[in-house]
Amino acid sequence: MTVRFGLLGAGRIGKVHAKAVSGNADARLVAVADAFPAAAEAIAGAYGCEVRTIDAIEAAADIDAVVICTPTDTHADLIERFARAGKAIFCEKPIDLDAERVRACLKVVSDTKAKLMVGFNRRFDPHFMAVRKAIDDGRIGEVEMVTITSRDPSAPPVDYIKRSGGIFRDMTIHDFDMARFLLGEEPVSVTATAAVLIDKAIGDAGDYDSVSVILQTASGKQAIISNSRRATYGYDQRIEVHGSKGAVAAENQRPVSIEIATGDGYTRPPLHDFFMTRYTEAYANEIESFIAAIEKGAEIAPSGNDGLAALALADAAVRSVAEKRQISIA
């Protein structure tokens, strides 16, 4: 069976998913929709699909699944529409910026028995998957501490930041999901600090560009997250998990893995410039997992509930900064 896809949204992340879907032998990109015709036409030209409206994709008999890459404030409504239309749904994070709206959306998904996967792509990165396998295989014993470093090469435009929900809901939310994925227990408390160290305009927009978070589970396990909107040396993505018998780490990746030694010292190529190249394999693996859930009934993960759990941690981090205290998770 070939899963026939409709793509909603032809922006930066839409292009990433168009490539992942088109590169899968069990998938076919049938149609793309975007508010900007030129963006949709560019993807249609690159991958041989049609340009249609969202309404047409919703009603189409030749579409089995959709990938939602539209602005965040449209996600929940589109999920509900396509759940009722009987389509399988892959939605980029977050489902919504409001937890109650997410819960209402997930009820529709449950009532319609729709398949919904949320786009936390880092779970599917081969290096991070190997970290999880080392944990599952007992190589490092019982997990005690997770340390996640995630730093963007530069800040997004302020106009984007104003509608993003803030750094915790836009950027750190990936790390909240990864912390849950690796800890093996749900965090029960969140302590966060935040500052504006890079661009005053970000602060004027009501957000931060430099944050740190400590998550703790009921048994005392901890996850420490470091985020920055500036890394002059490239896209900084590292994870270390410390356990009772050892530790496992995934270091930064480079487009070319060479090292040059001369009398002046050692040099290595720069890091990947951003997520589009750093996580190419992750996006492909993510779509592969979604297709397996559609075709074979495999478990869907990350699920809508995973999206809600990550948002709850982001909301708690926002409160922690505002109230300057540790926040308990109900």
From Swiss-Prot:
Write down the superkingdom of origin. Bacteria
Q: Which organism is it from?
A: Rhizobium meliloti (strain 1021) (Ensifer meliloti)
Residues of the signal peptide = none
Name the chain's protein: Inositol 2-dehydrogenase
EC assignment: 1.1.1.18
Q: List, alphabetically, the SUPFAM superfamilies matched.
A: Glyceraldehyde-3-phosphate dehydrogenase-like, C-terminal domain, NAD(P)-binding Rossmann-fold domains
Any Pfam family: GFO_IDH_MocA_C3
Reactions mediated catalytically: myo-inositol + NAD(+) = scyllo-inosose + NADH + H(+)
Induction (free text): By myo-inositol.
Q: What is this protein's function per UniProt?
A: Involved in the oxidation of myo-inositol (MI) to 2-keto-myo-inositol (2KMI or 2-inosose).
Q: Which UniProt keywords apply?
A: NAD, Oxidoreductase, Plasmid
List the GO terms this entry assigns under cellular component, sorted alphabetically.
cytoplasm
Q: Which GO terms describe its molecular function?
A: inositol 2-dehydrogenase (NAD+) activity; nucleotide binding
**Pathway terms, separated by semicolons:** Polyol metabolism; myo-inositol degradation into acetyl-CoA; acetyl-CoA from myo-inositol: step 1/7
Could you tell me which InterPro entries the record lists for this protein? Gfo/Idh/MocA-like_OxRdtase_N (IPR000683), GFO_IDH_MocA-like_dom (IPR055170), Myo_inos_IolG (IPR030827), NAD(P)-bd_dom_sf (IPR036291)
Record gene name: idhA
Q: Which GO terms describe its biological process?
A: NADPH regeneration
Q: Which family does it belong to?
A: Belongs to the Gfo/Idh/MocA family.
